[in-house]
Amino acid sequence: MSTLSGRRAVITGGAAGIGAAIARSFAAEGAHVVIADRDAAAAESLATELGGESWEVDLLAVASLESLSLEADILVNNAGIQRVAPIESYEPEMWRRIHTLMLEAPFLLIRAALPGMYERGFGRILNLSSVHGLRASAFKSAYVAAKHGLEGLSKVTALEGAPHGVTSNCINPGYVRTALVEAQIADQAKTHGIPEADVLEKVMLTEAAVKRLVEPEEVASLATWLAGPHAGMVTGTSYVMDGGWSAR
C-alpha cells in the first residue's frame, strides 16, 4: 500500500518548483493532491497530470482566508517570494507583502485546516522554511524575519496539535534550483557589485560544504517521508538540507 494512500494534501505554490516536485511525489505515493496557486492554468495542468484538483488562490488576499474551512490531511505551506536589498532602501510595502504571504497566510491556512485534522485524529503540516529560518544573510531582512517567524509558528502548532495526532515541522533547504533562486541572481549581482556569473560561487554557495544547488526532488523526498505514517513522532523540529552551510 502506498504510504499516502487516501490522504488529501494541499500544497501552496504547488504549480512549479518545490511545490510541484512535492505534489508529484505525494501523488506517486497515493495522495489526492490539491495544487494551490495563483497561476490557475499551471495549477490545473499539473492537477490534471496527477489526477488531483487545482485551487486558484491569491494568498496575499488574506481577508478571504479568515473564514476558510480547509479539508486537508496534509498541508504544505510552500508559497514564497524574495527581495534582495539593504535595509535602508527596503520598500516597506515589499516587507509587508513578504510577511503576508510567508507568515500570515500560513497561519490562516493552518488555522483553517486544524479543526478537520483534530476531528480525524491525524494531520501533517509541513512548512517550507529555509536555512534562513535558522541563519541570517545580509540584504534579506524581510525574508529572514518571515522565515524565523514561520519556525516559531510551526513549533507552536506542533505543541497544540500533538494531543490530536497532528505534527508540524519545517524543512530548511539551502538554495534550491527554482525560478525563485534564479531570479535572485541579478539582484545579488547588483547588490554585491559582481557579475551574475559569479553569484553562485561567491555569494550563494560560499558557506555550503557541498558546492551545488539543492534539487526540488530532494526536498520532495523529505517532505513525503514527513507526511507519511513513519514520522508520527517527528514534530516541532526543523530538517536542514543545506549542504553543510549551518554546520559552520
Language model: regions and residue ranges:
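Active-site helix of classical SDR
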Residues: I110, A146, S154
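Substrate-binding pocket helix/loop in short-chain dehydrogenase/reductase
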Residues: P86-I87, M94-H99, I125, M204
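Short, small/polar-rich loop/turn modules that mediate ligand/substrate recognition or access, typified
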Residues: A162, T167, V234-G236
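Canonical Rossmann dinucleotide-binding motif of NAD(H)/NADP(H)-dependent dehydrogenases/reductases
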Residues: L4-H32
